[in-house]
Amino acid sequence: MYRLEQYKNIIDLTIRPREPLILSEREKDGICDEMLSVLLEERNEIAAFSYPYKVKRDLIWGYLNQRLPNPVSARFLEIQDKLFWSETLENGIVDVADIPCRDRIALWQGDITRLNADAVVNAANNRLLGCFIPHHKCIDNVIHSRAGVEVRLDCSKIMGAQGEKEPSGCAKITRAYNLPSKYIIHTVGPMVGRKVTDEDRRVLRGCYTSSLNLAKEMRLESIAFCCISTGIFGFPGFLL
């Protein structure tokens, strides 16, 4: 298993404070135009911005889903982060300290990308690069799409250094960038066949323990888990 100590120096894990940011509709529209210019140029497509804002924002979402982890300019990251962080603030941040808990454990239903936990856990695939299907509603897509292109770039660096696909039941960590959380912990759950096996259970248990151990290694105080492998990977939720 490729451990934190082996990749922590090839990505930036330093947390930087973010200031409150409110963008006008005109500012958002201008950022979308500039981002689309870059993304369309990469795709060798012609730029045309007569669309309403929501259509342009959805185009950005889909294009970023499909974009390979190639380098991007500092200017692109600057304007992307402004737009995405303003959207995070508009969506509202849920303070994990306000969620009722028992024995330091809480069950909460909602959008995990709104939680300000020290880390949120992403149910990833073994490429660890996020979902490439435009506008797909899986948690992997949603987390990458709202955090920003930096997450895919960081994961690509980790995977390049690791030299192989991510084993199921392990975990990796990146910054969360434009999410309210500080970090994202990425873990790959078991893909269940016709019935759940003991190996499936062992691997799923490993996802949770590996994530918790990584959080402990990073000295994090709160971690938010989504349900791992209960979607298209087929692990029955009632067995969790």
PLM region descriptions:
Residues M1-L240:
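Macrodomain-like recognition of ADP-ribose-binding/processing modules
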